[in-house]
Structure formats: structure tokens, C-alpha cells
């Protein structure tokens, strides 16, 4: 048995959906532990491309229990839309469970999110406008609506009547927006409650029961380490904790049940929205990465900013999450390049810096120090074993593993499940501390 956390080692969009889908084959339970509809993941199965925002990737496996944990924030309309989409494709959602203590995104959250971002002007932070930040803010202020509140009609009416009256003052006085009709919102969300009710459980208890039966549990993070509220490029971050430690809080488990952490990173780097990005490319190579990598957001459709691989933030992600091994995705996107650059350190005001700075202002002043390596100029999308890769591609992977000080367990060479090289067992491999002690950081 192994309980594994899958996290993004960059700014999100690393390909966690595909990796989680692959690992879900050997999982009994998959738990999404944070975030909301601001995060999207894409899974390609045969000719079908599924884009999901809330439902865990493991939903494609009928024997895998899929749980939306208490650390998430749920937009019921979007969630039920995903359920309907899957059922129309003949994919059952009977094995989908929803934490009763997850918070609910309401219409006023979306309105406040969008109006607040617009009001920021040139100081915007790049929110998706889906109401995630305001939902988490209400959670912290202890005024939020939880899934279990939806299940209590009288309590919901009382709570929403008071809350909407308060939010209408904010909408009017602060943003100049028309008020919401409380009765309409109560009626709408009461309808959602009845459709969600069969899926609602005490998720912490459900996960504990699975653990006691020695089931394999996979914890699925959304977004990435550099978007973490506490450890990311603040203030250009999300409102939750995508890091591995967030899995315990967002799922309702103790840290001792986590056996392994798998970090997912692209073979280059992308970022959506605002914020510093030292290795960002603005010319032809940046455009090539964007087009070949289809770098457009699953949630918003926004064009992703593209740049070279940044080993400084990679090492930071390894440290913050305790990453045991890596899954490197989209290696094939680099196939046509004559040479590839990797950021190995930063120059800040003439001094070398090997570590990620906590200040966004300092990070914005970082100039990347690059190591240039040769490209391989041939297709890798057909490769299924390390031996099939061009030597330069294999050398590139080894270089990344050395810089990150963890082994590479999975290499993804395309969106399909079969476009994957399993280098070593990502679930049952040795712990990072042992690898570090032995000095073993190669990719093979």
C-alpha cells in the first residue's frame, strides 16, 4: 500500500491531470484537496479529450472512489455540469463523493472577484474571476456557506438572507453593482442541494476507513507550488495551499499517512496571468513553445506565458513539498530546438543567488543565469523507453534531475496515456532522503 500526493512543481498547468490519470489505475481512492473551478485539468483517452475543473481525474476508473475534499471550494453549477457531461459520455459518477465541509462559491463571490480585479487597474493579480478568493475569504471570516449548509433548507434560508443583505451593501457601495435577489439565490442553490445530496459524505471519515483497510490513496493537488498562498510568488498566488502539506488539511488526514510525494513539471516553464517570470521568452522561441505545447488555459482559455526551465524554482518546489521523484511532461515540445537553455541560478544586482527569493519585488529583479545544452532535432513523441530517446534528450533529463536533486520517474511525450515512459516505479520507489544520502540523482 502507498498513499501518494501529486503536486505541481511550477506555476500550475504542468500536466498533473495526465499523471494523476496514469497513477489512478493503481489507486483505490483519489482525493482532490484544494482549489476550485479556477483550476482545470485535461485528460485524453483515445479520441476523447476531457476537461475537468472540480472532479478528480480518477473518475474515469469506475472502481476508484473519487473525493472532492473539504479544502476545496465548490461551484455547484459547474460541478453538476461536469457530472452531466461525463454521464452523457457514458462515464458513471456514482463513485464521486463530496465533502460535507467543503465551502460553496456563491454568485456574490464571482461578482466581487470580477469587480475587485477590475478595480485594481494596473495592479491586477490575474484572478480567473470565478469567485475563488472571495469564497476562501468568507471561509476565513467564518461567514461562508458549506455543502452541509445546503442540505439544511431552513438554516440555508436564514444564513443566505443575512449574508446576501451584507454582500448587497458591498456590491452597491464599493462597486456600484445592482443587488442580488435573495429569494432567487436561495431557490437556485436549494435545487443544487437535492442533486448533490447522494454524493455528500464525511470525507475525512471515508478516507480514514480506506486507510484502515490499507487502500491506496492518491491526493491530487490543483495549480502549483509557486501559486501557493503561503509559499508562492505572493501576491500573485491562489487563495489555497497546493503544496503537499495542503493535502493533509484539505483532505482531513494526518501527515504520517503520506508515503510519497510526486512533483510534476514541464520540460520548460509556463505561467498564466500576472507576476514575475524570470525565464519568460517573448520572441520566436516563446511563440513556438506556446503553439507546440498548446499553451492555453483549460479554465479561462488565456494564453500561457512560456519560458525556459527554471531549476531554481524547481529546487524550491522539491524543498517545500519534500518531493521524492519527478514527472517531466511535454518533453516533445522541445523536439525542434537547436539548443535549449536552463536557468541554474539568478543574478540579483550583480550577485549570484541559488535560491528562490520570498519578495515579489526581488524576484522581479532576478536575471536568469543560463546553462545552454544541445537540442536533439528529432521527434520523441513515439518513444516508449529511455533507450528510444535521442542521446541529447536523455542528457537533458539527466541534467534536470541533477539540478533538482531528485530522480525522474515518469517522462510524458504527448497528451495521450500511451505517450509515456515509466523510468522507475513512481509510487514505491525509495524516499528522497535516502537518494540524497547516497548521492543518486540520475534520471535512469
From Swiss-Prot:
An annotated GO cellular component: cytoplasm
Residues binding IMP: 13-16, 38-41, 128, 142, 223, 238, 302
GO biological process: 'de novo' AMP biosynthetic process; IMP metabolic process
Reactions performed catalytically: IMP + L-aspartate + GTP = N(6)-(1,2-dicarboxyethyl)-AMP + GDP + phosphate + 2 H(+)
Root EC class: ligase
EC numbers on record: 6.3.4.4
Pathway(s) this gene product operates in, as recorded in its UniProt entry: Purine metabolism; AMP biosynthesis via de novo pathway; AMP from IMP: step 1/2
Name used for this protein in its record: Adenylosuccinate synthetase
UniProt source species: Synechococcus sp. (strain ATCC 27144 / PCC 6301 / SAUG 1402/1)
